[in-house]
Amino acid sequence: MIYLHNIKLTAMSKILVLGAGIAGHTASAYLRKWLPGEHEVIVVSPNSYYQWIPSNIWVGVGRMTIDQVRFKLAPLYKKWGIVYKQARAVSVHPEGDSEIQSGYVTIEYTSDEQKGQIEKVPFDFLVNAIGPKLNFEATEGLGPGKNTVSVCTYSHAAEAWEKLQQCFSKMQKGEKQKFLIGTGHPTATCQGAAFEYILNVDYEIRKRKLENLAEITWISNEYELGDFGMGGAFIKKGGYVTSTKVFTESFFVQRGIRWIKQAGVIKVEPGV
C-alpha cells in the first residue's frame, strides 16, 4: 500500500475526479503520474474539451481563436491511461447502496454516442473539482443570448469578439460607442477577468485609433478599485510598493476609463 498526502491507497484503488478544468485536469494528471499502474484514475466531465480559461480574454478581443485555447480530452487521457467519461455528475452516494458497497457517483452521459445514458461509477477516493456554476439567472437580463456578452467560456468569448467587431465597424463610420464592463451581480467575486478584458478592449480600440469615439466605463461591486475580491494587494516594483487601488486607478486615469464602484448590478435592460 502507498500513502498520498496521508491517504492510504490499497491495491487497485479507484480515484474518481469530477471535473476536467484547471483543477480537475491538474489533479488527474498528477494522480496518474504519481500512482502505480494498478490504481485506476477516472475523470468525469460533461465537456469534450479542456480549455485554458485565462486565454478566453484574448479570444474575446480576437487575438486568439477558440482552437488555440482548447484541446480534445479523450485522445490525451487515452494516451495517459486515464479513464475518461464525458458525462455530468448527477448525485454523489458516499455510503453506496445495496448494489455497490463502496461510494459511487451517478452520472449522465453528454457525448453524442451515449447521450442520456445513466451509470453508477464506484470510487474509493473522490476529488471534487467541478468548478463554479455560471449563474446568469441571478441578474435579470444578464448573459449571452440576453443583454450582455461574457468571456466565461470560449464560446462566450467568441460571441463577445463578434459583438466587439460590430462596435468597431460603427466607430469606423463615426458612430460613438459606449462600453460598460465589469461584474454582473452584487455578490460577484471574480473582478480580475473583467479587469483584464476592459484593458484589452481599450488596447484594441486604441490600436485602431478609435479612442475618441469610445466611452469605456468600469462597473464593480468592489469597495475600492483594485480589491479584486481579495481586499486588494500590494505590488513591489523598482523599489516602490504600490497598492492595487492606486495601481488600478492610475491605469484607468491614464486611459480615460471611467469607473463606478460599490455598485451591484440587479438588472440589465436592452439598448441601455
Model-predicted regions and their roles:
Residues 2, 7, 85-196, 200-209:
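FAD-binding core/adjacent interface of flavoenzyme oxidoreductases
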Residues 25, 108-113, 268-271:
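Short gly/ser/thr-rich secondary-structure transition/capping motifs
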Residues 13-86, 185-242:
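Beta1-alpha1 glycine-rich phosphate/pyrophosphate-binding loop at the start
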Residues 2, 28-30, 70, 112-115, ...:
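A generic local structural motif
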Residues 81-91, 253-269:
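A conserved beta-strand/loop element that lines the FAD pocket in flavoprotein oxidoreductases
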Residues 71-75, 244-253, 266-268:
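Charged, low-complexity cytosolic intrinsically disordered regulatory segments
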Residues 236-260:
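A glycine-rich helix N-cap at a beta->alpha junction
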